[in-house]
Swiss-Prot record:
Its EC number is 2.7.8.13. Its cofactor is Mg(2+). The chain crosses the membrane at residues 21-41, 73-93, 98-118, 132-152, 168-188, 199-219, 236-256, 263-283, 288-308, 338-358. It catalyses: UDP-N-acetyl-alpha-D-muramoyl-L-alanyl-gamma-D-glutamyl-meso-2,6-diaminopimeloyl-D-alanyl-D-alanine + di-trans,octa-cis-undecaprenyl phosphate = di-trans,octa-cis-undecaprenyl diphospho-N-acetyl-alpha-D-muramoyl-L-alanyl-D-glutamyl-meso-2,6-diaminopimeloyl-D-alanyl-D-alanine + UMP. Signal peptide: none annotated. Pathway: Cell wall biogenesis; peptidoglycan biosynthesis. This is Phospho-N-acetylmuramoyl-pentapeptide-transferase. Belongs to the glycosyltransferase 4 family. MraY subfamily. It comes from the Bacteria. It comes from Actinobacillus pleuropneumoniae serotype 5b (strain L20). GO terms for molecular function: metal ion binding; phospho-N-acetylmuramoyl-pentapeptide-transferase activity; UDP-N-acetylmuramoyl-L-alanyl-D-glutamyl-meso-2,6-diaminopimelyl-D-alanyl-D-alanine:undecaprenyl-phosphate transferase activity. GO terms for biological process: cell division; cell wall organization; peptidoglycan biosynthetic process; regulation of cell shape. PANTHER family: PHOSPHO-N-ACETYLMURAMOYL-PENTAPEPTIDE-TRANSFERASE, PHOSPHO-N-ACETYLMURAMOYL-PENTAPEPTIDE-TRANSFERASE HOMOLOG.
Length: 360
């Protein structure tokens, strides 16, 4: 929005030309989103308390979690507001890639909102009926994927980048739709499963979004894309603004979500953030890199799949409890130790992921 205003005002004062620079707008998007999150946080928490939108806790979970019962949830609303306002202000809204990510972000946020609402109303952790939840997640993902495919099917935007191999970039064609669908829906649910401890999901999200800001900038820059042997996707550079908005909103939310949390993001936050990360990975053609950098999300999801599969096949559990962060809690690890160690692991994986861009 401000890009259009600056383009008009630059004829009167060339200083407004600074708004045309992605780096400037990226920093401003981060600061704007963070400022909004910090500003509206107390009011959002107060209203959630008045509405009695409190967290429900599994009765078979760690005893330390019982004290969390009643803590305001659905705090992801403040994340969505911060990202939405910041992006609308600082991004070039003529860029279709921005709208694809926002569509998934708010679409998944709506599904998460309904899921959270039913958990609160029923006073249990069941939420929205699973088949309806996955139906709507799938519909939203497929609409976005078909749109992305229609825009980029004749360009490098449907290539698959394989880490460590610079000359291996197969053209996916129609299979792009299948892969992209699973990346978006899978990442959304993986982040959702990770969101079980104070700050556990939001900090890895911030780290991965920060890395994707760098990757989006390189992907949208012809010279850097050639230098790194990655696909050049002309519209991708503008995603830097959205990535930094996610980082800023995440930092603003972390202020209130750090241990001991004053508010939880709920499914309205975790499903939407995961969906946004998955969509960004698809747009910059780095789906496999997301698996590396978001390794904590992947392991959390796999732990649930393995636990359920093992119990159905052998009537035995692999972990004391799934997702795996609860396993470590039941082993006696204090919650802050689990959280910080998962943060450290994510930082290492993100750095490894960024290094693979050069080691190819």
């Amino acid at each position: 929005m401000l890009v259009w205003l600056a383009e008009y005002l630059v004829q009167y004062n060339t200083a407004f030309n600074v708004v045309s620079y992605i780096t400037f707008r990226a920093i401003m998007a981060l600061l704007t989103a963070m400022g909004i999150g910090l500003w509206i946080g107390p009011e959002v928490i107060r209203r959630l308390q008045l509405l009695k939108f409190g967290q429900e806790v599994r009765n078979d979970g760690p005893e330390s979690h019982f004290k969390k019962r009643g803590t305001p949830t659905m705090g992801g609303i403040m994340i969505l507001i911060a990202i939405g306002v910041s992006t609308l202000l600082w991004a070039d809204l003529r860029n279709s890639y921005i709208w694809f990510v926002l569509f998934v972000l708010f679409g998944y946020g709506a599904v998460g909102f309904v899921d959270d609402y039913w958990k609160i109303k029923r006073k249990n952790t069941d939420g929205l009926i699973a088949r309806w939840k996955y139906f709507w997640l799938s519909v939203i993902a497929l609409i976005a994927v078909f749109g992305i495919y229609a825009v980029g099917k004749d360009t490098a935007a449907t290539q698959l980048v394989v880490p460590f191999f610079k000359d291996v970039m197969p053209q996916l064609g129609i299979f792009f739709i299948i892969l992209s669908y699973f990346v978006i829906v899978g990442t959304s649910n993986a982040v959702n499963l990770t969101d079980g401890l104070d700050g556990l999901a939001i900090v890895p999200t911030i780290m991965v979004a920060s890395a994707f800001a760098l990757i989006a900038w390189a992907t949208g820059n012809f010279n850097f894309a050639q230098y790194l042997h990655i696909p050049f996707v002309p519209n991708a550079g503008e995603l830097v603004i959205l990535c930094t908005a996610i980082v800023g909103a995440g930092l603003g939310f972390l202020w209130y979500n750090t241990y001991p949390a004053q508010v939880f993001m709920g499914d309205v936050g975790s499903l939407s953030l995961g969906g946004a990360l998955g969509t960004i990975a698809v747009l910059v053609r780095q789906e496999l890199l997301l698996v590396i950098m978001g390794g904590v999300f992947v392991v959390e999801a796999l732990s649930v799949i393995l636990q359920v599969g093992s119990y159905k096949l052998r009537q035995k559990r692999i972990f004391r409890m799934a997702p795996i962060h609860h396993h470590f809690e039941l082993k006696g690890w204090p919650e802050p130790r689990v959280i910080v160690r998962f943060w450290i692991i994510t930082l290492m994986l993100v750095l490894i992921g960024l290094v693979t861009l050069k080691l190819r």
